[in-house]
């Protein structure tokens, strides 16, 4: 019984060492060059969507005057019953990147 437990513990330890050794993988020069190339484009792939990464966009249930005041995937809504005052930002039914 002691031998079986010892073998099991050694097996788990060897699997741990093998998995941690595979995580410590060095990048090839081509991979490093590709990552540097992609990072040079910086903001090229960023979109000009309303409210994306905008500090002045309004969050959920924040006051608004129009859809552009609200953050991404939020639209300016009003209550359906009178009074129609106090519009707020609410989910506009979209998901993902536009």
From Swiss-Prot:
One Pfam family recorded for the sequence: Toxin_12
Signal peptide positions on this chain: 1-21
Disulfide bonds: 57-71, 64-76, 70-89
Compartment(s) where it occurs, according to its Swiss-Prot or TrEMBL record: Secreted
Coiled coil (UniProt feature): none
InterPro entries noted in UniProt: Huwentoxin-1
Main location: secreted
Protein family: Belongs to the neurotoxin 10 (Hwtx-1) family. 27 (ICK-3) subfamily.
Domain notes: The presence of a 'disulfide through disulfide knot' structurally defines this protein as a knottin.
Protein name: U10-barytoxin-Tl1a
């Amino acid at each position: 019984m002691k031998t079986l437990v010892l073998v099991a513990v050694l097996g788990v330890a060897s699997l741990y060492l093998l998995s941690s050794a595979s995580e410590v993988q060095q990048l090839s020069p081509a991979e490093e060059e590709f990552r540097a190339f992609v990072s040079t484009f910086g903001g090229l792939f960023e979109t000009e969507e309303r409210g994306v990464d905008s500090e002045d966009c309004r969050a959920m249930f924040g006051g608004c005057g129009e859809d552009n005041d609200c953050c991404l995937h939020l639209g300016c809504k009003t209550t359906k019953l009178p009074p129609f005052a106090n519009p707020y930002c609410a989910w506009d039914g979209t998901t993902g990147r536009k």
